[in-house]
Amino acid sequence: MAAAKQKGFKAVPLNLTASLNFENDIARKASKNVVGVMKGTKRPDEYVLYTAHWDHLGRCTAAADGDDICNGAVDNATGTAALVALAEGFAKAGAPERSAVFLAVTAEESGLLGSKFYAENPVFPLSQTVGGVNMDAFSMSGPAKNLTVIGKGKSQLDLYLEAAAKSEGRTPETEPTPEKGFYYRSDHFSFAKLGVPMVYFEGGDDLVTGGKAAAMAAAEDYEKNRYHAPGDEFDEKWDWSGVMSDLKLYYRVGRMLAMTDAWPNWNEGDEFRAVRDKSRSGK
């Protein structure tokens, strides 16, 4: 075992055999997606989508103090709260030209099941869904100079995000670790694979206070001590200014989409382009 942990280790035959058997219990449960819509004034049959997952893990591996409740305060109560705040913002601004859909999906942590179910059984046709934005876990470390776009370069929605970011003095940047496949690990993927252009970004890795070093330290601390663990709880010391900055971008992107007659598509050659073209052609 010690040798296997060393660089350059190569597998060796153990000349052993093993026989295993195990039992599995299957629990069937029902959970709900929650959807709200603000009807558009000029093109009510065209839809702009906001998504966030409201579920988390429930009980999980207990912490040292015995707490075994995974509350999911950051992941994803922050996104769910943002969804409600955006709906309130749209209501205060007045109905846009296109309809705005606010979708809180369940069972993301169980394999994107809620968004998958909606995408396959949509309340509003995906062929008439212009595009959307997904929100999954906001950074509570304060405002950033940049924003990290997951899947940057995939669709024409980047243009809307770039315009929104410019108005806030921020710079969209490509995710530093695309090999981790984050674009395929949250609810926007359920819609993307059926053709709907979706944008997803994170708060940024260059904080206004502390720069990249502070951002990395905060991210590592969250992943080590709170991510999918009982420690992901509300903290009165949270810095909400970064959340508000990100929320403005989500609002601007959705509002711009809802106030235009343009139909942004996946960029030429993208894996989801063909299914979108087929959906829009009605074939």
Named regions from a protein language model:
Residues 1-2, 43, 95, 105-223:
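Metal-dependent peptidase/peptidase-like ectodomains
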Residues 1-72, 85-88, 92, 97:
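Soluble metallo-hydrolase cores and metallopeptidase-like ectodomains found primarily
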Residues 17, 26-29, 270-283:
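Extracellular/periplasmic ectodomains of large secreted or surface enzymes and adhesion receptors
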Residues 21-25, 33, 64-76, 91, ...:
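Second-shell loop/turn segments in exported
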Residues 27-29, 47, 73-80, 108-111, ...:
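Solvent-exposed, acidic/flexible segments
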Residues 48-51, 97-106, 131-134, 267-269:
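Beta-strand segments within the central parallel beta-sheet cores of soluble alpha/beta enzyme folds
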Residues 80, 84-87, 112-119, 158-162, ...:
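Extracytoplasmic/secreted envelope proteins and their assembly/folding machinery
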Residues 88, 92, 207-276, 280:
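His/Asp/Glu-rich mid-to-C-terminal helical/loop segments that flank catalytic regions of hydrolases
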